């Protein structure tokens, strides 16, 4: 049985109690109750929980496996296929409890995007639910003279295809999930850092920079730097560890 977050804890406890230990239980995210609440717990590395039954990864699990991204690349919509290289995916977040996104922050991002456009890039831009109107507007203005697709919130979000088609990616630092998904591509990821932040976010981004997946977005991009790294697929790492520990406990089944 697999649960996610604190809301799943009563159900996990009930399953353990009524199955009398015959069910292997897993919780994703820190349950804030200590590590004994389940047989196995996954937390991101920037969280503090540790224990013999706790596994950690740098990024969170997501659905963008190498196989899925390869399939998406083979099935690109014509409007994305038509965009000239280099294609730059711009993934916009917004204000949260850690990052402020001042007007000056918005303008800094716009200046960086304008400089990327001058290098001949095309753009694939998608906002998130937290993206404030001014940030989207300045990103729109900064890229309007280049070939681009800017998702306006209507219809299905082409975000999965943007990840698959991108030669480079620009992601705002406020979302661990968006940054982790960008790093599933194995392509260069520039991270834009708004005002404030927190120690957890700083640790997370420093770790990704340390393993060579991301770099800070320069105020003015004079060239699109190339670097490579193994695509980061934490879901596969977690799944293998769940299977390994399950088999250690219950043995192989036929």
Which functions belong to the PLM regions below?
Residues 35-102, 217, 221-232, 236:
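A nucleotide-sugar donor-handling region in carbohydrate enzymes
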Residues 206-254:
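Leloir-type glycosyltransferase catalytic cores
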Residues 85-86, 95-127, 131-132:
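Conserved catalytic-core segment of nucleotide-activated headgroup transferases in glycan assembly
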Residues 1-6:
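Short N-terminal targeting/anchoring amphipathic segment
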Residues 34-35, 50, 98-99, 131-137, ...:
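Short, charged/polar "capping" segments at the starts of alpha-helices
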Residues 120-155:
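Catalytic donor nucleotide-activated moiety binding site of glycosyltransferases and closely related
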Residues 10-26:
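Glycosyltransferases and closely related glycan-assembly transferases
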Residues 159-201:
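A donor-sugar binding/catalytic signature common to diverse glycosyltransferases
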């Amino acid at each position: 049985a697999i649960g996610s977050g604190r809301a799943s804890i009563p159900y996990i406890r009930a399953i353990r109690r009524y199955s009398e230990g015959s069910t292997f239980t897993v919780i994703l995210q820190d349950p804030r109750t200590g590590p004994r609440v389940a047989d196995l717990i996954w937390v991101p590395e920037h969280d503090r929980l540790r224990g013999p039954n706790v596994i950690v990864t740098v990024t969170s699990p997501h659905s963008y496996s190498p196989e899925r991204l390869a399939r998406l690349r083979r099935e690109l919509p014509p409007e994305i296929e038509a965009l000239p290289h280099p294609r730059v995916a711009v993934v916009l977040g917004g204000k949260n409890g850690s990052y402020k996104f001042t007007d000056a922050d918005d303008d800094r991002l716009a200046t960086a995007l304008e400089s990327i456009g001058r290098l001949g890039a095309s753009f694939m831009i998608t906002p998130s639910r937290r993206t404030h109107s001014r940030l989207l507007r300045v990103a729109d203005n900064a890229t309007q003279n280049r070939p681009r697709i800017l998702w306006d919130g209507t219809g299905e979000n082409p975000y999965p295809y943007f990840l698959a088609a991108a030669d480079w990616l620009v992601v705002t630092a406020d979302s661990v999930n968006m940054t982790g998904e960008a790093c599933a591509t194995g392509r260069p990821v520039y991270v834009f850092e708004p005002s404030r932040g927190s120690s957890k976010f700083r640790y997370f981004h420093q770790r990704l920079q340390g393993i060579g997946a991301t770099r800070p977005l320069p105020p003015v991009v004079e060239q699109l730097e190339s670097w490579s790294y193994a695509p980061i697929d934490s879901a596969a790492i977690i799944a293998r560890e769940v299977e390994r520990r399950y088999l250690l406990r219950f043995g192989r089944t036929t």
